[in-house]
Amino acid sequence: VWSADRDFSRVQFEKMCDLADKYGMKLNLEFVPFSNIPGLTEALAWMDLMDRPNVQVLVDTLHAHRVKVTPEQLREVAAERFGFVHLCDGPAFIPPVDHPDMVGVARGGRLYVGEGGIDLAGMLKNIPDPPYYSIELPNAAEVAIRGKLEHARRCLETAKTFFAAHQI
């Protein structure tokens, strides 16, 4: 949710939920530190406010790390509230929200799963049975070095290796 007008944003999101519901579809609400829904707590509160059965929370591992979501917080969320997990790793360092790296890393400098400083295992093991995982790993430098196809292959390879090593 990017608009500063929360009422407008809520009404528009509710309209999308209602339209999607007509077709049996669900929507995912992603929290992003530099948006108007910056964290898990805010996303869940927004979902409660909208009271739509077809909206779920999307957990992006980079964003969750940056807003210091704990494994305990994830474990406390009912399984049916999770819709999607965006997988990537990233630097352990958490920049201030107005620092260029806050947006820069998110949009073009994410790291391969298991190759950064995020406690991915702690996070992923505490999200009860998410229906979907998706690798979201924009990294301009890796694409320039490896090419798009090899970058995509490496994204999948590192995720599979990480999941096997951590029994996820």
Features from the language model and the residues they span:
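Active-site acidic/histidine proton-transfer and metal-coordination neighborhood
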Residues: 1-57, 66, 166
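Hydrophobic faces of well-ordered beta-strands that scaffold small-molecule active sites
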Residues: 1-2, 27-29, 55-59, 82-87, ...
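A generic structural signal for short
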Residues: 4-5, 32, 62, 111-112, ...
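A general structural detector for well-ordered alpha-helical segments in enzyme core domains, enriched
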Residues: 12-16, 42-46, 73-74, 119-123, ...
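A structural motif corresponding to the C-terminal end of an alpha-helix
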Residues: 19-24, 122-130, 161-168
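Catalytic metal-binding/acid-base residues of hydrolase active sites
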Residues: 32-33, 62-63, 91, 138
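Gly/Pro-rich active-site loop or hairpin
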Residues: 40, 65-130, 142-150
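C-terminal helical cap(s) of enzyme catalytic domains, especially alpha/beta-barrels
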Residues: 145-168
